[in-house]
Amino acid sequence: VICVNRKDGSVAWNTEVHRQKPGPMRKQNSYATPTPVTDGKYVYSVFYDGTVAAVDFSGKIVWKNSEVKFFSLHGLGASPILVNGQVIMPFDGSSREENQVGWKIPWDKAIVLSLDAENGSVRWKGQRGESRVGHVTPILVDKGRQLVSAGGDRVQGFDPKTGKRIWSIYSQGEGVTPSPAVGDGLIYTSSGFEAPTLRAIRLGGKGDVTKTHIAWEQKRGVAALSSLLYVKPYLYSISRDNILHCIEASSGKIIWMERLSGVHWASPVYADGRIYILSEEGVTIVLRPGAKYDEVARNDIGDTCLASMAVSQGNFYIRSAQHLYCIGN
Protein backbone atom coordinates (compact mmCIF):
# COMPACT_ATOMS: atom_id res chain seq x y z
CA VAL A 1 0.00 0.00 0.00
CA ILE A 2 1.47 3.33 -1.07
CA CYS A 3 0.62 6.70 0.46
CA VAL A 4 1.14 9.64 -1.90
CA ASN A 5 1.07 13.34 -1.00
CA ARG A 6 -1.93 14.69 -2.91
CA LYS A 7 -0.31 18.13 -3.36
CA ASP A 8 2.98 17.18 -5.01
CA GLY A 9 2.86 13.41 -5.68
CA SER A 10 5.73 12.57 -3.35
CA VAL A 11 5.58 9.16 -1.65
CA ALA A 12 4.94 9.51 2.09
CA TRP A 13 5.30 5.80 2.82
CA ASN A 14 5.29 2.44 1.07
CA THR A 15 4.27 -0.61 3.13
CA GLU A 16 4.50 -4.23 2.04
CA VAL A 17 1.20 -5.59 3.31
CA HIS A 18 0.97 -9.06 1.82
CA ARG A 19 2.79 -11.66 -0.27
CA GLN A 20 0.90 -14.15 -2.39
CA LYS A 21 1.58 -16.94 -4.85
CA PRO A 22 1.24 -16.12 -8.57
CA GLY A 23 -1.80 -17.56 -10.29
CA PRO A 24 -3.93 -17.26 -13.42
CA MET A 25 -5.61 -14.02 -14.44
CA ARG A 26 -6.47 -11.98 -17.51
CA LYS A 27 -3.50 -10.04 -18.86
CA GLN A 28 -5.30 -6.76 -18.07
CA ASN A 29 -5.70 -7.76 -14.43
CA SER A 30 -3.21 -7.53 -11.55
CA TYR A 31 -2.57 -8.98 -8.09
CA ALA A 32 -3.91 -5.82 -6.45
CA THR A 33 -6.79 -4.77 -8.69
CA PRO A 34 -9.45 -3.96 -6.03
CA THR A 35 -9.58 -0.26 -5.16
CA PRO A 36 -8.73 0.44 -1.50
CA VAL A 37 -11.33 2.16 0.67
CA THR A 38 -10.96 4.25 3.83
CA ASP A 39 -13.11 5.36 6.75
CA GLY A 40 -10.67 8.10 7.71
CA LYS A 41 -9.02 5.89 10.32
CA TYR A 42 -7.74 2.90 8.38
CA VAL A 43 -7.20 2.01 4.72
CA TYR A 44 -8.63 -1.36 3.66
CA SER A 45 -7.18 -3.33 0.74
CA VAL A 46 -8.08 -6.66 -0.87
CA PHE A 47 -5.62 -8.82 -2.77
CA TYR A 48 -5.74 -11.47 -5.49
CA ASP A 49 -5.87 -14.50 -3.16
CA GLY A 50 -8.74 -13.10 -1.04
CA THR A 51 -6.68 -11.58 1.77
CA VAL A 52 -8.12 -8.38 3.26
CA ALA A 53 -5.79 -6.02 5.13
CA ALA A 54 -6.10 -2.79 7.10
CA VAL A 55 -3.32 -0.24 7.58
CA ASP A 56 -3.38 3.00 9.53
CA PHE A 57 -2.35 6.39 8.16
CA SER A 58 1.27 5.87 9.15
CA GLY A 59 1.45 2.67 7.07
CA LYS A 60 1.35 0.27 10.02
CA ILE A 61 -0.54 -2.99 9.44
CA VAL A 62 -3.49 -3.15 11.86
CA TRP A 63 -4.96 -6.50 10.85
CA LYS A 64 -5.13 -9.09 8.08
CA ASN A 65 -7.86 -11.60 7.29
CA SER A 66 -7.41 -14.62 4.99
CA GLU A 67 -10.80 -16.21 5.67
CA VAL A 68 -11.45 -16.58 1.93
CA LYS A 69 -9.10 -18.63 -0.25
CA PHE A 70 -10.10 -16.98 -3.51
CA PHE A 71 -9.46 -18.39 -6.96
CA SER A 72 -10.63 -17.36 -10.41
CA LEU A 73 -9.26 -17.88 -13.89
CA HIS A 74 -9.89 -14.17 -14.44
CA GLY A 75 -8.28 -12.99 -11.20
CA LEU A 76 -10.09 -10.68 -8.77
CA GLY A 77 -11.89 -7.57 -10.01
CA ALA A 78 -14.44 -6.32 -7.47
CA SER A 79 -13.63 -3.76 -4.76
CA PRO A 80 -14.67 -3.54 -1.09
CA ILE A 81 -17.11 -1.01 0.35
CA LEU A 82 -17.63 0.28 3.90
CA VAL A 83 -20.99 -0.06 5.63
CA ASN A 84 -21.55 0.89 9.29
CA GLY A 85 -18.22 -0.34 10.63
CA GLN A 86 -17.99 -3.25 8.19
CA VAL A 87 -15.71 -3.97 5.24
CA ILE A 88 -17.89 -5.82 2.73
CA MET A 89 -16.38 -7.66 -0.22
CA PRO A 90 -17.92 -10.12 -2.74
CA PHE A 91 -15.93 -13.19 -3.77
CA ASP A 92 -17.43 -14.77 -6.90
CA GLY A 93 -14.70 -17.17 -7.96
CA SER A 94 -14.30 -20.54 -9.65
CA SER A 95 -12.87 -23.97 -8.87
CA ARG A 96 -9.13 -24.70 -8.88
CA GLU A 97 -9.73 -28.33 -9.81
CA GLU A 98 -12.25 -28.04 -12.65
CA ASN A 99 -12.06 -24.99 -14.90
CA GLN A 100 -15.71 -25.12 -15.93
CA VAL A 101 -17.08 -25.11 -12.37
CA GLY A 102 -17.98 -21.64 -11.20
CA TRP A 103 -17.07 -20.21 -14.58
CA LYS A 104 -19.43 -21.98 -16.99
CA ILE A 105 -21.20 -24.20 -14.46
CA PRO A 106 -22.92 -22.56 -11.43
CA TRP A 107 -21.80 -23.65 -7.97
CA ASP A 108 -22.52 -22.72 -4.36
CA LYS A 109 -19.12 -21.40 -3.20
CA ALA A 110 -19.56 -17.69 -3.95
CA ILE A 111 -20.03 -15.45 -0.91
CA VAL A 112 -20.36 -11.84 0.15
CA LEU A 113 -18.01 -11.37 3.13
CA SER A 114 -18.43 -8.83 5.93
CA LEU A 115 -15.50 -8.09 8.26
CA ASP A 116 -15.40 -5.88 11.33
CA ALA A 117 -13.53 -2.75 10.24
CA GLU A 118 -11.86 -2.37 13.64
CA ASN A 119 -10.33 -5.82 14.07
CA GLY A 120 -10.94 -7.84 10.88
CA SER A 121 -13.13 -10.52 12.46
CA VAL A 122 -15.94 -12.04 10.41
CA ARG A 123 -19.31 -10.37 10.94
CA TRP A 124 -21.23 -12.49 8.43
CA LYS A 125 -21.01 -14.43 5.18
CA GLY A 126 -23.84 -13.84 2.73
CA GLN A 127 -24.58 -16.86 0.58
CA ARG A 128 -25.29 -16.49 -3.14
CA GLY A 129 -26.70 -19.96 -3.68
CA GLU A 130 -25.95 -21.31 -7.15
CA SER A 131 -24.01 -18.68 -9.11
CA ARG A 132 -21.00 -18.10 -11.35
CA VAL A 133 -17.92 -15.91 -11.67
CA GLY A 134 -18.40 -12.16 -11.23
CA HIS A 135 -16.33 -9.05 -10.58
CA VAL A 136 -18.93 -6.55 -9.41
CA THR A 137 -18.46 -3.98 -6.63
CA PRO A 138 -21.68 -3.83 -4.54
CA ILE A 139 -23.69 -0.67 -3.84
CA LEU A 140 -25.99 0.53 -1.06
CA VAL A 141 -29.63 1.41 -1.80
CA ASP A 142 -32.83 2.17 0.09
CA LYS A 143 -31.09 4.67 2.40
CA GLY A 144 -28.46 2.09 3.30
CA ARG A 145 -30.94 -0.60 4.28
CA GLN A 146 -29.98 -2.90 1.41
CA LEU A 147 -26.72 -4.02 -0.14
CA VAL A 148 -27.12 -4.85 -3.84
CA SER A 149 -24.51 -7.28 -5.12
CA ALA A 150 -24.38 -8.98 -8.52
CA GLY A 151 -22.69 -12.33 -9.08
CA GLY A 152 -22.10 -14.16 -12.34
CA ASP A 153 -25.75 -14.98 -12.94
CA ARG A 154 -27.52 -13.43 -9.96
CA VAL A 155 -28.39 -9.94 -8.80
CA GLN A 156 -29.20 -9.99 -5.10
CA GLY A 157 -30.20 -7.75 -2.23
CA PHE A 158 -28.76 -8.40 1.25
CA ASP A 159 -29.44 -6.98 4.69
CA PRO A 160 -26.09 -5.29 5.48
CA LYS A 161 -26.59 -5.84 9.22
CA THR A 162 -26.99 -9.61 9.08
CA GLY A 163 -26.01 -10.79 5.60
CA LYS A 164 -29.46 -12.31 5.09
CA ARG A 165 -30.41 -12.50 1.42
CA ILE A 166 -33.62 -10.53 0.86
CA TRP A 167 -34.22 -11.02 -2.85
CA SER A 168 -32.61 -12.50 -5.92
CA ILE A 169 -32.99 -12.13 -9.68
CA TYR A 170 -31.60 -14.57 -12.22
CA SER A 171 -29.33 -12.83 -14.74
CA GLN A 172 -27.82 -14.99 -17.46
CA GLY A 173 -24.11 -14.40 -17.89
CA GLU A 174 -20.64 -14.94 -16.47
CA GLY A 175 -17.68 -12.77 -15.73
CA VAL A 176 -20.05 -9.87 -15.05
CA THR A 177 -18.05 -6.70 -14.38
CA PRO A 178 -20.15 -3.47 -14.39
CA SER A 179 -21.35 -2.28 -10.99
CA PRO A 180 -25.04 -1.40 -10.68
CA ALA A 181 -26.31 2.16 -10.77
CA VAL A 182 -29.35 3.53 -8.96
CA GLY A 183 -31.81 6.31 -9.81
CA ASP A 184 -35.50 7.06 -10.33
CA GLY A 185 -36.26 4.43 -7.69
CA LEU A 186 -34.71 1.70 -9.86
CA ILE A 187 -31.51 -0.37 -9.79
CA TYR A 188 -29.78 -0.74 -13.16
CA THR A 189 -27.67 -3.83 -13.82
CA SER A 190 -25.76 -5.19 -16.78
CA SER A 191 -24.61 -8.67 -17.79
CA GLY A 192 -22.33 -7.92 -20.70
CA PHE A 193 -21.18 -11.41 -21.66
CA GLU A 194 -22.87 -14.56 -22.97
CA ALA A 195 -26.43 -13.16 -22.96
CA PRO A 196 -25.98 -9.35 -22.79
CA THR A 197 -28.89 -7.76 -20.94
CA LEU A 198 -29.45 -4.36 -19.37
CA ARG A 199 -32.16 -4.33 -16.70
CA ALA A 200 -33.99 -1.95 -14.41
CA ILE A 201 -35.08 -3.58 -11.15
CA ARG A 202 -37.70 -2.34 -8.70
CA LEU A 203 -37.00 -2.51 -4.97
CA GLY A 204 -39.40 -3.99 -2.45
CA GLY A 205 -39.40 -7.66 -3.35
CA LYS A 206 -38.58 -10.77 -1.34
CA GLY A 207 -37.34 -14.15 -2.52
CA ASP A 208 -36.98 -14.84 -6.24
CA VAL A 209 -38.35 -11.71 -7.94
CA THR A 210 -37.20 -12.47 -11.49
CA LYS A 211 -40.77 -12.53 -12.80
CA THR A 212 -42.17 -9.66 -10.74
CA HIS A 213 -39.64 -6.85 -10.24
CA ILE A 214 -38.00 -6.19 -13.61
CA ALA A 215 -39.27 -2.77 -14.70
CA TRP A 216 -37.71 -2.96 -18.15
CA GLU A 217 -35.12 -4.94 -20.08
CA GLN A 218 -32.88 -3.86 -22.94
CA LYS A 219 -30.73 -6.02 -25.22
CA ARG A 220 -28.93 -3.08 -26.83
CA GLY A 221 -26.45 -0.74 -25.23
CA VAL A 222 -25.37 -3.29 -22.64
CA ALA A 223 -22.29 -2.35 -20.59
CA ALA A 224 -19.70 -5.14 -20.67
CA LEU A 225 -16.70 -3.81 -18.74
CA SER A 226 -17.14 -0.27 -17.45
CA SER A 227 -19.90 0.44 -14.93
CA LEU A 228 -23.16 2.20 -15.64
CA LEU A 229 -23.55 5.92 -14.93
CA TYR A 230 -26.86 7.53 -13.93
CA VAL A 231 -27.29 11.28 -14.41
CA LYS A 232 -30.96 12.16 -14.10
CA PRO A 233 -32.95 11.40 -16.23
CA TYR A 234 -30.54 9.31 -18.30
CA LEU A 235 -28.43 6.19 -17.95
CA TYR A 236 -25.07 6.09 -19.76
CA SER A 237 -23.61 2.77 -20.86
CA ILE A 238 -20.55 1.78 -22.92
CA SER A 239 -21.13 -1.46 -24.82
CA ARG A 240 -18.51 -4.06 -25.68
CA ASP A 241 -18.06 -2.56 -29.16
CA ASN A 242 -17.21 0.82 -27.55
CA ILE A 243 -20.45 2.59 -28.39
CA LEU A 244 -21.69 5.05 -25.78
CA HIS A 245 -25.45 4.80 -25.25
CA CYS A 246 -27.65 7.40 -23.62
CA ILE A 247 -30.77 5.64 -22.33
CA GLU A 248 -33.94 7.03 -20.82
CA ALA A 249 -33.63 5.59 -17.32
CA SER A 250 -37.35 5.31 -16.64
CA SER A 251 -38.19 3.33 -19.79
CA GLY A 252 -35.04 1.82 -21.31
CA LYS A 253 -35.50 3.77 -24.55
CA ILE A 254 -32.23 4.58 -26.33
CA ILE A 255 -31.97 8.35 -26.83
CA TRP A 256 -28.69 8.48 -28.75
CA MET A 257 -25.56 6.47 -29.55
CA GLU A 258 -22.01 7.56 -30.29
CA ARG A 259 -19.11 5.36 -31.33
CA LEU A 260 -16.07 6.10 -29.21
CA SER A 261 -12.47 5.80 -30.37
CA GLY A 262 -10.28 3.39 -28.45
CA VAL A 263 -11.13 0.71 -25.88
CA HIS A 264 -12.86 1.48 -22.59
CA TRP A 265 -12.21 -0.40 -19.34
CA ALA A 266 -12.51 2.53 -16.94
CA SER A 267 -15.98 3.55 -15.77
CA PRO A 268 -17.36 6.98 -16.72
CA VAL A 269 -17.60 9.50 -13.90
CA TYR A 270 -19.79 12.56 -13.32
CA ALA A 271 -18.26 15.65 -11.73
CA ASP A 272 -19.11 19.36 -11.71
CA GLY A 273 -21.87 18.97 -14.31
CA ARG A 274 -19.77 17.01 -16.81
CA ILE A 275 -19.28 13.36 -17.77
CA TYR A 276 -15.68 12.16 -18.09
CA ILE A 277 -14.87 9.03 -20.11
CA LEU A 278 -11.30 7.66 -20.03
CA SER A 279 -10.07 5.24 -22.71
CA GLU A 280 -7.35 2.59 -22.50
CA GLU A 281 -5.25 4.82 -24.75
CA GLY A 282 -5.31 7.62 -22.15
CA VAL A 283 -7.80 9.91 -23.87
CA THR A 284 -10.50 11.53 -21.73
CA ILE A 285 -13.67 12.76 -23.44
CA VAL A 286 -15.62 15.45 -21.59
CA LEU A 287 -19.37 15.61 -22.27
CA ARG A 288 -22.34 17.66 -21.21
CA PRO A 289 -25.09 15.24 -20.13
CA GLY A 290 -28.33 15.51 -22.05
CA ALA A 291 -30.57 14.40 -24.90
CA LYS A 292 -27.81 14.79 -27.52
CA TYR A 293 -24.11 13.96 -27.74
CA ASP A 294 -22.36 17.17 -26.69
CA GLU A 295 -18.57 16.90 -26.49
CA VAL A 296 -16.87 19.74 -24.62
CA ALA A 297 -13.22 18.69 -24.69
CA ARG A 298 -10.80 15.86 -25.38
CA ASN A 299 -7.56 15.40 -23.43
CA ASP A 300 -4.75 12.91 -24.05
CA ILE A 301 -2.14 11.89 -21.45
CA GLY A 302 -0.59 9.36 -23.85
CA ASP A 303 -0.48 6.52 -21.33
CA THR A 304 -2.27 3.18 -20.98
CA CYS A 305 -5.24 3.47 -18.60
CA LEU A 306 -7.40 0.61 -17.34
CA ALA A 307 -8.45 1.89 -13.90
CA SER A 308 -11.31 4.32 -13.33
CA MET A 309 -10.33 7.84 -12.32
CA ALA A 310 -10.96 9.22 -8.83
CA VAL A 311 -12.29 12.72 -8.19
CA SER A 312 -11.51 14.69 -5.03
CA GLN A 313 -11.44 18.39 -4.10
CA GLY A 314 -11.51 19.57 -7.70
CA ASN A 315 -8.80 17.21 -8.93
CA PHE A 316 -8.83 14.05 -11.04
CA TYR A 317 -6.49 11.22 -10.04
CA ILE A 318 -5.65 8.81 -12.85
CA ARG A 319 -3.64 5.62 -12.36
CA SER A 320 -2.06 4.52 -15.62
CA ALA A 321 0.10 1.48 -16.30
CA GLN A 322 3.21 3.49 -15.40
CA HIS A 323 2.24 6.64 -13.53
CA LEU A 324 -0.16 8.32 -11.11
CA TYR A 325 -1.50 11.62 -12.44
CA CYS A 326 -3.22 14.51 -10.69
CA ILE A 327 -5.19 16.69 -13.12
CA GLY A 328 -6.52 20.04 -11.92
CA ASN A 329 -7.21 23.61 -12.99
Kindly give the residue locations of the regions a language model identified.
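Noncatalytic, solvent-exposed loop/strand surfaces
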Residues: 1-329
